[in-house]
């Protein structure tokens, strides 16, 4: 019975354990403004889709609320540097008809998160690259994969700073 009591105390203590660092943005960052990224590509859909996904992920994964730039604790800015679509990945098995079965998109962005209270750069990374594969004539599906991966890399990068 004594062993059960000791084991219970150890298990409960483990439930109360938490990390003081590495958990995201500094405590005073409660709101964030995501400025639409500059678009250096010919694709008009990427900026809007990336903006929407990043706003949702910051709230759900980092627990910050969206705010206008003038009232936000932090500001996210960036540039979409490259978007390449229609890169052939897989071909049909029929040698008589060499058609592409799968294609790939590649997305490259630069991003910066700045603490507006202190002026300090919280996270900055150039040339974050992600890819997405899609079936013939389904580019939006591949683009969605690439955007989700970019957003995930940004969130994980911001979390790892603390």
What are these regions (language model features)?
Residues 1-15:
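Sec-dependent bacterial lipoprotein signal peptides
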Residues 14-56, 68-71, 85-88, 114-117, ...:
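A structural "domain/chain start" motif
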Residues 42, 46, 50, 101, ...:
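Conserved acidic
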């Amino acid at each position: 019975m004594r062993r059960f009591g000791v084991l219970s105390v150890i298990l409960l203590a483990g439930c109360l354990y938490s990390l003081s660092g590495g958990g995201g943005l500094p405590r005073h960052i409660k709101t964030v403004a995501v400025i639409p990224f500059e678009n250096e590509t010919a694709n008009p859909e990427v900026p809007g889709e990336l903006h929407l996904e990043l706003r949702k992920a910051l709230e759900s994964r980092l627990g910050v609320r969206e705010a206008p730039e003038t009232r936000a604790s932090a500001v996210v800015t960036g540039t979409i540097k490259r978007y390449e679509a229609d890169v052939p990945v897989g071909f049909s098995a029929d040698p008589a008809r060499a058609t592409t079965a799968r294609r790939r998109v590649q997305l490259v962005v630069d991003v910066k998160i700045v603490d507006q209270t202190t002026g300090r750069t919280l996270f900055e990374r150039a040339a974050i690259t992600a890819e997405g594969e899609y079936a013939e004539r389904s580019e939006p599906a591949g683009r969605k994969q690439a955007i989700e991966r970019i957003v995930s890399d940004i969130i994980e990068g911001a979390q790892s700073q603390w």
